[in-house]
Amino acid sequence: MILPDHKIRKEILIEPFNEKSLQPAGYDLRVGKEAMVNGKFINVEEEGKLVIPPKGHALILTLERVKLPDDVMGDMRLRSTFAREGLLGSFAWVDPGWDGNLTLAFFNSSEEEVILHYEERFVQIAFHRLEEPSKNPYRGIYQGSQHLKLSKRKIR
């Protein structure tokens, strides 16, 4: 079951919470303070925006911290405005028990720059209730993230 707006407001910790971001069946996450575009760190809060060049790759931190109970998972989708501009997003499930800001990956498939502004709504997250609480909620290496996180995968 996907949680409706009133249950999201009551059951999911999102901070800072923005009433304009609350949707009938989800919440619009906003561009946070940090990003990395083609390997270069950007202080989005200071710059006011980030620019993803054509065929460019970006990691973007969400403004919001999201904390999920052990019986709820998150599923994220790029807002259609950005898909229409050629932006593609690759997002993992947000596991039950997750707590932190999210680092999300994007690719600009277009021939034009895509500009995202600090605090702009860019990804919607929907919350799905599990049949029962997870016996093994997320407690992994990215738990508690407050800053942009690069891959912690070990390459041999």
From Swiss-Prot:
Residue ranges crossing the lipid bilayer per the database entry: none
Amino-acid positions noted as binding dCTP in the UniProt annotation, renumbered to this chain: R79, S80, T81, F82, A83, R84, D95, Q124, Y138
Name the Enzyme Commission number(s) assigned to this protein.
3.5.4.13
**EC primary class:** hydrolase
Pathway field of the UniProt record reads:
Pyrimidine metabolism; dUMP biosynthesis; dUMP from dCTP (dUTP route): step 1/2
Entry keyword set: Hydrolase, Nucleotide metabolism, Nucleotide-binding
Q: What does this protein do?
A: Catalyzes the deamination of dCTP to dUTP.
According to UniProt, the name of this protein is dCTP deaminase
Q: What is the organism of origin for this protein?
A: Thermococcus sibiricus (strain DSM 12597 / MM 739)
